Amino acid sequence: MNIFALFETRVREALESLTRSGRLPEGLDLSRVVVEPPRDASHGDLATNAALVLAKEAKQNPKALGEALAEELRTDPRIVEASVAGPGFINLRLAPEVFQDVIRAALSEGENFGRGQMPGGPVNIEYVSANPTGPMHVGHGRGAVFGDALANLLAAAGRPVTREYYINDAGAQVDVLARSAYLRYREALGETITIPEGLYPGDYLKPVGMRLAETHGRTLLDQPEHEWLPQVRRFAIDAMMAMIREDLAAIGIRHDVFFSEATLQGENGGKVAELLDALRQKGLVYEGRLPPPKGQLPDDWEDREQTLFRSSQFGDDVDRALLKSDGSFTYFASDIAYHRDKWLRGANELIDVLGADHGGYVKRMQAAVKAVSDGQARLDVKLCQLVRLLRAGEPVKMSKRAGEFVTLRDVIDEVGRDAIRFMMLYRKNDATLDFDLAKVVEQSKDNPVFYVQYGHARRFSVLRQAREALPGEDFSPAALLADADLSVLTDPGEIEMMRLIAQYPRVLESAAAAHEPHRIAFYLYETASSLHSFWNKGKDLPQLRIVNPTDRNSTRARLALVEALGGVLASGLAVLGVSAPNEMR
């Protein structure tokens, strides 16, 4: 039950009534009419902008139109007050029965409460895509958690979602990986090695070298580089991806598709060559020279005639090169081919989750997706800012020794999956995140993950208290739904909890539409806080205790309320990929 959608429909019906009575002209554009929470909760339960956005088209004063609409809305018994504020906003105060119906809906729908049928076709979300050259670091973890939570969020809102990882296994960096692993292979066979500048010095490649020695013995030593390099490269990539998958599994990250970059460039150029042919057929490829970029020239800029894509026709700043001077494809050409492949597989919305250093990538790829799909697909690029590791407010040294750094696995082992996931999502993705290893394990209100999980655990602790105080009573959701008298819930704290529960479907919907899972984390903290506050009031005022053995009616009503609120906490935590414990240990 989404009260915002429900009363948006009611507002539209009231506007139609005004049209039928001649007080509004026909054919008004209602697409911008919304119902949302008022900016100040003291003004009411809902607010609509209808009078403001329609006044100009209707050629009416917005306040006068607002008064006419408010008068029409007051005829609805579910609306106890409709008042015009400011330039023409209409604030609505709802009858208690509306919120009682929300609680009943939450109890009857269980984990499906708030989940929607968001319009739109299949979504492809690509996230993590860390180079298979070493362990994941904390920055990778932020993108992984954000992408996974966004996938959960869109799925909860009703969109079909494909979760994808792009394996960068075709660039020069995997040859560097292979040569580094080959040195560790020689080391495993007893040689003393020196790792030259430009190769990967980390100890994480020692086990790869040992497994190479176990698999191949000394045979690779007798082969020239052009023979052993492809074998070691494939072996090392597989080993790195196995390590990355283990790290992802440790924080509950999953993917449906692992797509290899190398598969794009098959025989005769493969899918990248197909892309160039498709762009040529559209008249979007030409031979020309690019003007020098402003400021310091990048190393890869060349003053020569090049094969260019007309990306500036689709919103990019300049046209882009598709072929290098040696005739090989540019990274950009491969990226376009990959995104075209995602679209051809059926996704009409593509989302890339990338590090903040990819800001320059956004316009060109959005232009490319628009071009290859003839405007049928759109690309949203979500950039994740840096993570600063702290311990009790002091920066943590990221490098432990030469070639070694603090890995995502180190952080998982220290603070656990739930703390990482919740805190990575408790700040907007494009803002730098301070992750304090000491604070995220505190058992206090200042630690959001503890505070929200404690709110969910409280759902079960009050249920245990009720069973002890009133043995033989049935406190299942179905029983509470059948006979709890919700009209006794009149305390401001109870009303606040009901209002927050009623907001959950809209929070889920708006967070999904904006691609912003942090909204769920903020909402969960506020909702858990409302339960903790009411619980604390009951310690001082016996009549407000959730479980009162001498008052069966209030006990059952409050348990119904807590059960509904706890269900919302569990649902929201599931979207974030965080556990909802029945008790805190």
UniProtKB/Swiss-Prot annotation:
Subcellular compartments: Cytoplasm
InterPro entries assigned to the protein according to its UniProt record, in alphabetical order: aa-tRNA-synth_I_CS (IPR001412), Arg-tRNA-ligase (IPR001278), Arg-tRNA-synth_N (IPR005148), Arg-tRNA-synth_N_sf (IPR036695), ArgRS_core (IPR035684), DALR_anticod-bd (IPR008909), Rossmann-like_a/b/a_fold (IPR014729), tRNAsynth_Ia_anticodon-bd (IPR009080)
Cellular component terms per the entry's GO annotation: cytoplasm
Top-level lineage group: Bacteria
Coiled coil: none
Enzyme Commission number, as recorded: 6.1.1.19
Motif 'HIGH' region per record, residues: 130-140
Classification via Pfam families: Arg_tRNA_synt_N, DALR_1, tRNA-synt_1d
NCBIfam families with a match to the protein in the record: argS
Subunit composition and interactions: Monomer.
Name listed for the protein in its UniProt record: Arginine--tRNA ligase
